């Protein structure tokens, strides 16, 4: 992997430091230092350079020799460290005052405060990890479920990157064959065994589709699904919200219009993160507060991934529900929920209406909730039993889609006479799209966008 000099790589001459543990009180706090002056920092703060990779007890002192704290110091000489540079960790007591005091003392020794994600960025620039692995670090820290953590670990261990690298090597081999044919076009030599190339392209396309499915599962685990509850007032939206959330997050009364503002909860269903929104009931009202609540409801519907349109089972689907359906954006999926079967006496069930999939349930008793949970996983395309998925982001999915589109074009034009140059270009486009995932083909703007979302000290 080759990275070219930029302002970012030139800043590697700086020594950086940051608190690496979460803010607040704790038994242990860590100040992490990386860069060429780690040995000098160790001597200044503790009076000696500790043996590499051994935890050594010491007193931490400021530049005037005053004791700040006591704890452990660890020294990792580069390149055998996380960042590939000399790294120092000062592990003291985890009070915020102690940590700030210790960090300030280190910064007074000519060290710069690290930017968010700069330690991981240096690991990437020093070829210790690729870009997908760097992103997996942040994903692992932010994991909201066991499944999300497992998928992030697989990416961190390089499983995602290894599959991408294998595909790039296969595309390189095909490009060599195609470009050799272009170079010797005047010598009546045909290097392309079109049957072989066609078969290889078919295999690459199939592998890309498989990787995309796994990556999409990982993206779902990371980003979750935005689900919005909508409907007329007093149809049980808030009761359904509370049932899904597992506690009484929303106030529930018999008075229509009780919910006047958005109420959001983050929940998980079998490991699938769901960002759930309860909204104000949509109806004709002259009340200023209700009108503002309904404006926010409509705005929330525009940004939804899936809408649960709740109706009263005793009333059925009315013109009011149909009007809400007509307002939904074309790319938003929805499920019709006929609630309150505890009053109508109908059994829980699922069927298909002219307008789409419908469920009959009771938010009060919980009857039919298993059908709703299954429906939400189905709409998201989530498979809890899917093994081998890895942490992925929207940019990864977009890159895989672009690579797949280029391979599709390559397969179509393979049999066209004189299309070798276009074929080679499509293969190159597929290669570059895949290289964006691991960072071998990237811009500094992309790096800035990615690493700025990391926590400081990582």
From Swiss-Prot:
- Top class in the EC scheme: hydrolase
GO biological process: what's one of them? Answer: tRNA methylation
| Species the sequence originates in | Nitrosococcus oceani (strain ATCC 19707 / BCRC 17464 / JCM 30415 / NCIMB 11848 / C-107)
Q: Could you identify this protein by its name?
A: tRNA modification GTPase MnmE
Looking at the UniProt record for this protein, which Gene Ontology cellular component terms does it annotate, in alphabetical order? cytosol
Gene (UniProt): mnmE
> Quaternary state and partners of this protein?
Homodimer. Heterotetramer of two MnmE and two MnmG subunits.
The UniProt entry's sequence similarity note says: Belongs to the TRAFAC class TrmE-Era-EngA-EngB-Septin-like GTPase superfamily. TrmE GTPase family.
Localization recorded for this chain is: Cytoplasm
The UniProt annotation places (6S)-5-formyl-5,6,7,8-tetrahydrofolate binding at: 32, 89, 128, 458
Under NCBIfam families, the record lists:
mnmE_trmE_thdF (TIGR00450), PRK05291.1-3 (NF003661), small_GTP (TIGR00231)
The role this protein plays is: Exhibits a very high intrinsic GTPase hydrolysis rate. Involved in the addition of a carboxymethylaminomethyl (cmnm) group at the wobble position (U34) of certain tRNAs, forming tRNA-cmnm(5)s(2)U34.
